[in-house]
Curated annotation (Swiss-Prot):
Record-linked CDD domains: WHTH_GntR
Keyword Transcription regulation: yes
Traits of the deletion mutant: Cells lacking this gene show a derepression of lutABC expression. They are also defective in bacilysin production.
Regions recorded as binding DNA: 16-35
Name of the protein this chain belongs to: HTH-type transcriptional regulator LutR
Matches recorded under SMART domains: FCD (SM00895), HTH_GNTR (SM00345)
Lineage: superkingdom: Bacteria
Length: 219
């Protein structure tokens, strides 16, 4: 599994129940996330056997899908669920395997987030850089490419929804900074469990805010 740094093409994923328990989400959320990964061509569901990571070239997933697809509320919801399943593992691995150079890159992105509170676009880019730096710190090449793919999709969606108060109000930007700071501190301390918890809290908050936006603004 991703959490242990052992995910590779051909591996069988844990059961829906096991994934739900591991990442503290509902079974329906796991099923939706797996369906999104299947749509991306990253996993294969075999009847009566389970779900397997597909064999593919890393460069096949280097380009994001069309942002237009993601403007539907349900698509964004599924993307965020996929991120939750992936990035909790990323945080744990980063805490275990990060180098000093990795920590410096993560901290640089964090500092940039804290210094440009009034600029939503640059804030999005710094947020993006923070999460990709965490993925780099996992020292898992496949996981880094998976994260780059999913995060690129999210960044495109963010650019299309700049009115979201998450990136337009100083108070919410400060909250985001503090959430990322907690993730960084846990990774720097080498505390995998704390890093997982901080990432889960962050992504749950992002999910709640974006869901609220789509409820109010997108039919």
């Amino acid at each position: 599994m991703i959490k242990n740094g052992e995910l590779k093409p051909g591996d069988k994923l844990d059961s829906v129940q096991a994934l739900a328990e591991s990442f503290q989400v509902s079974r329906s959320a796991v099923r939706e996330a797996l369906s999104a990964l299947k749509a991306m061509g990253l996993v294969e569901m075999k009847q009566g056997e389970g779900t397997y990571l597909k064999e593919f070239e890393l460069n096949q997933i280097s380009q994001p899908l069309s942002a237009a697809l993601l403007m539907k509320k349900e698509d964004v919801k599924q993307l965020l669920e996929v991120r939750k399943l992936l990035e909790i593992g990323v945080a744990s691995l980063a805490a275990e395997k990060r180098t000093e150079a990795d920590l410096e890159r993560i901290q640089d992105a964090l500092k940039e987030m804290g210094s440009i509170e009034a600029d939503g676009e640059l804030g999005e880019k710094a947020d993006f850089a923070f999460h990709l730096a965490l993925a780099d710190a996992s020292q898992n090449e496949l996981l880094k490419h998976l994260m780059n793919h999913v995060s690129s999709l999210l960044l495109e969606t963010m650019r299309e929804t700049r009115k979201i108060w998450l990136f337009s109000k100083k108070t919410s930007v400060q909250r985001l900074y503090e959430e990322h700071e907690r993730i960084y501190n846990a990774v720097a301390a080498g505390n995998g469990a704390q890093a997982e918890a901080a990432m889960l809290a962050h992504l749950t908050n992002v999910e709640d805010v974006l869901s609220g936006y789509f409820e109010e603004n997108v039919q």
